[in-house]
Curated annotation (Swiss-Prot):
CDD domains with a match to the protein in the record: IlGF
Annotated spans, C: 78-89
Start and end residues of each stretch annotated as A: 90-110
Cystine pairs: 54-96, 66-109, 95-100
Region (B): 49-77
Family: Belongs to the insulin family.
Any GO BP annotation: positive regulation of D-glucose import
Region (D): 111-118
GO molecular function: growth factor activity; hormone activity; insulin-like growth factor receptor binding
Entry protein name: Insulin-like growth factor 1
Propeptide residue range(s): 119-153
Amino acid sequence: MGKISSLPTQLFKCCFCDFLKVKMHTVSSSHLFYLALCLLTFPSPATAGPETLCGAELVDALQFVCGDRGFYFNKPTGYGSSSRRAPQTGIVDECCFRSCDLRRLEMYCAPLKPAKSARSVRAQRHTDMPKAQKEVHLKNASRGSAGNKNYRM
């Protein structure tokens, strides 16, 4: 019984081995060499280095990284720890002419703005204006020596 149940398994192994032998003979060693060379020359995403960003691509990347904070094209004053006055480099020098990564882009983001108080200037009504400012406004309006010309400020 043991020989009958293992017979299909043996036939499968034999046919599969013969199939592999035929396929291996048709692939030459030069084909394998070129295949290995191609696989080694393709960079994988994990090993790909930082890229250069210029023009609109650089601005888009900065807007993506910095979000609502905004960004600077030059390093803010007081940036870095060197005491010497080196020529100031900007984001274009660092990311367009050379490659840069996300950390380098983040260095050019503006600092976070502090949260505004609950009662901001926009939240005030026009009637909340102090009387002194209203009086000055009325005095300026009564000086009609402008010859009926409207000036915008």
